[in-house]
Amino acid sequence: MQLSVDIRNDFTPSEDLIREIAADFRTGLFVEGVMEPENVEISLSFVTPEEIRTLNRDYRDKDEETDVLSFPADEETPDVYLLGDIVISTDRAEEQAREIGHGLDEEIRYLAIHSLFHLLGYDHMDDESKRVMREREKETLALRKRIDTLTERALEAKTHAYIPYSHFHVGAALETEDGEIFAGANIENASYGVTRCAEQVAMLKMAYEGARRIRILAVTGDADYTYPCGVCRQMLREFADEDTVIVVANDRSDFRLHTLDEILPYSFGPEDLDV
């Protein structure tokens, strides 16, 4: 996901905030089922109260200040899909953050997620459409929280890797449908075939404890976006389903999201044996 940022006021967003917003957008696009989200481009502008009022008047016939505006582009080029522009009044966001009792960054992130779903075609003109849009926002926020937690656990697990041969650290953490978390690191062996990948260690621990269904799996390693090997993908197939989220992370705000079918298409599983 490509995010371009334009600052047209005296607000200076931190690099962490921009990374978090980009991660929120990737999560929202995944929730919406957008294929190839890396090719999507979104423009984010921070503006003054005067500018957002002018935009609101010129494009929505409302001569009043507001907190955020969305301008869908829906333009596709050979290399990128331009989803649209998001414009946030940081002054209004700061006022709302004080009223609600949370930080400015948190308010800006929520406004950005809210606006993302406007770009994706959602609205809140009536109670039902408002409910549907709000559910999408909640789903995105909840998934981001799970990604944060599991990525942190996977990064911590990576430090426990036993890797005298490859010197390549991998950590994994999974959450079951009951909310239990199991973590693992790669454990190598002089007889290379006995080596166990981090994902396998986590899944074996889970299975031993009696859990059988994975809601989300996070994997992190020394390489840029360390993906599960073929054996791990097949083992994951035993305990995952179409709703399982696979997170391939460098850190908690730099990750890719996949479904099982994306990383293991045309797979063989228990149902093929009528189990």
Give the location of each predicted region.
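Short, basic/aromatic recognition patches
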Residues: T149-I163
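An acidic/histidine-cluster motif and surrounding catalytic segment
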Residues: M1-R109, L119-K145
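Short loop/turn motifs at secondary-structure junctions and domain boundaries
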Residues: P37, I163-S166
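Short beta-strand scaffold segments in enzyme catalytic cores
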Residues: H167-T176
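Zn2+-dependent cytidine deaminase-like catalytic core
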Residues: A183-D272
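Short, well-ordered amphipathic alpha-helical segments that serve as non-catalytic structural scaffolds
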Residues: A22-R26, R153-E156, A198-K205
